[in-house]
Amino acid sequence: MRSLAVYLKNYKKESILAPFFKFLEVVFDLIVPIVIAQIIDVGIANHDNKYIVQRFFILILMAALGLASSITAQFFAAKASVGFATKLRQAVYDHVQHLSFTELDTLGTDTLITRLTDDINQVQNGLNMGLRLLLRSPFIVLGSMVMAFTIDFKCALVFAVAIPFLFLVVFVIMFFSIPLFKKVQGKLDTVTGLTRENLTGVRVIRAFCREKEAVAEFDTRNQELTKLNLFVGKLSALLNPVTYVLINIATVILIQKAGVEVNLGGMQQGQVVALYNYMAQMIVELIKLASLIITLNKSAASAGRVADILKVKSTMDYPSSSTYSAQISKDLATATADASLSENAIVFNDVTFEYSKAGAPSLSHISFSVKKGQTVGIIGGTGSGKTTLVNLISRFYDASKGTVLLDGQNIENYTRSDLRSRIGVVPQKAALFKGSIRDNLKWGREDASDEDLWQALTTAQGKEVVEGKPGQLDFMLEQNGKNLSGGQKQRLTIARALVKKPEILILDDSASALDFATDAALRKSLNRLDWKVTTFLVSQRSSSIQQADLILVLDNGTLAGKGTHAELLRTCDTYREIYFSQFPEERARYSSVSAGSIMKEVTV
């Protein structure tokens, strides 16, 4: 937890006052056995009722002061722990937002959710208990021993011998349990991930009648977590009985020695009661300490896992504003000297990309250029690298080799904000958030007017969808847009990107749920936009990209062909195969046309 202590810096006062008031509570608690001994040895022995009443009110005062100190300590501990957890959770969330897709792919969504919720809650609980009890228990144990020595040196030696044995037991159990708590949290990650996967894909599971297999797999993982939890629980449970045995042995020895001293006249009965009370206080606090150590072990394991997230550094760096301005001036001068650079919106120069730990590149030696205002279609088989290519344009990933240019400048020279403002992305999976349609559309541009929103909806063929909803723009969407159909969600996500009025618009197979008529109307509307936009259309439908100015054909990560529809039908086997698989009636016509062309050439 040491590396996370920085998030306590705004709660230094609370972190000091909480144990301080616990210390005051300990002082008041340690006075109580002495007062009780005085009541027995003086008040009762001398039949002095006045003395007994006086000491009784002192006991009441000590109890009241102890209670007030305890409540105050709890207040400061709660304030510090809750504030710490809030800042830590925000810091982790902010850190995750700045990680590149490479790190997010490596960490996994389920791991991040567990660490942002369960792990941070464990750390918060550990800090709260630590501030209240971590010092209180040692204070009581050591204080009881000191007070015992003030009563009788020989009897107090029992305390001095028992305490080291108790701490040895605590240390041994802690030594073995800490690594196991880390394993428990790891198993919890696995169960969380499996739960999320199965609940997300529950319709697919039922469609393939895989319920039994899904339940069996979950049961296996859950049993692994349960068995490990039981083992750790049994190990931790040893703490209390072993502590009790040692304390009870010490108590028997204490009473035996104290009884002998009373018979010899070296001690009074009240002092024996005081010694026993101090021993009882030690028992209670050592039990609390045992529970505290278990909690702190869990917190330490969780703190380490949270710290691991904060240690992950993004492999993607963005330039500072000053560096960016200087680079822009330099690149503008270069672009002015070379007119071709200023005409191109996007240029790929021998780009190769490989996902982390993939073992093979997903894109290899890709080169092409796109002029401003052009529409580019990207087509290819499953796994050919279509989404990967457009992700490089958005700089969700950095190219492993080669360069990607935006407006004649290396895309890595743009600041994050400037790059995002230029590019509008509609991903494959339509993602909407809980809130009104208006709130979701304004993700594109916060200052957009309702007129801008309706204009974007009209272009995205989503106007009728919104007009048919109660409240229209104020219609509330459920999480991930569950109260909309797939096609409706896609149209809203396209509209959200259009609200931004980006220079580069990327539609990553984002019209797959639209019928052919709506898809055609969408493409027609995109061609009539009132600003100059370069559009990238990723699609499985060759009909969706036939009218594109440039079509890129990908095959297993390589650029199999590029050109217009007519050019690719003549020159690219991969494109012909895709096209004719979707329009088989065209194959015969193409064959007859090709044969006629060959005969004509032979005749000539």
Task: Annotate each predicted stretch with a short phrase.
Residues 10, 14-27, 58, 62, ...:
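Transmembrane helices of ABC transporter permease
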Residues 1-29, 36, 44-59, 65, ...:
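Membrane-integrated ABC transporters
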Residues 46-47, 82, 90-114, 118-120, ...:
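Short intracellular "coupling" helices and adjacent cytoplasmic loop segments at the cytosolic face
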Residues 20-21, 25-41, 53, 62-109, ...:
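Juxtamembrane helix-loop junctions of ABC transporter transmembrane domains
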